[in-house]
Amino acid sequence: LDFDRTDTGKICLTDEQTGVPVTENLIFRAARCLQEDTGCGLGANIHLHKRLPMGGGLGGGSSNAATTLVGLNALWETALSKQQLMTIGEKLGADIPLFIFGQSAWAEGIGEQLTAIELPPVWYLIVVPDAHVSTGKIFAHQGLTRNTHPIKIRAFLERGGSNDCQAVVESLYPQVKEARLWLAQF
């Protein structure tokens, strides 16, 4: 993301490939929320250089919104605290506060209650199946149950966790299941 401050009060967002209408883009919405919540009359020209695949489940949109809040807070000199930025971010998406938090954290509630945790270093292999997984579609799906017993930090650190969305995602996007099964053989 590139940010240029303007005195016009307008938010102009350009991107290379998302195809999302500007007013629905989390970057634009984050900038607008920051303006409204602070009464800031400044604007910005924002350019997105998209590198993560849309619908890949990697939090790209939420990370971009968090970066926008943090970046424009500095650029516009609105002097909001990290906690205030996290509160604005929560209005836009449950995982946005995590990206503002800026370190590994245990999330509770809908993702807004964060506790810093230390995690051992790990390596990740990212496989990108030919699927655009819609977060909204997954969370609205009838098959996504809300009856999972909460797990505590200690149990997670000792035994790991699970992904409640996995069964729904794999039923709607078989190519995701194929990729997981392929990885499981190693």
Predicted regions located by residue number:
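Glycine-rich, charge-dense phosphate/pyrophosphate-binding loop(s)
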Residues: A30, G39-C40, N45, M86, ...
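A short core secondary-structure module
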Residues: D130-T145, I153
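DPxDG-like acidic metal-binding loop motif
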Residues: G56-K82
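Glycine- and acidic-rich phosphate- and metal-coordinating loops
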Residues: C40-G56
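N-terminal beta-alpha supersecondary unit
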Residues: L1-L42, T148, R154-A155
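Alpha/beta catalytic cores of group-transfer enzymes, especially the acyltransferase/condensing modules
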Residues: T78-V133, P174
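Residue-level signal for inorganic ion chemistry
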Residues: L1, I27, G61, V127, ...
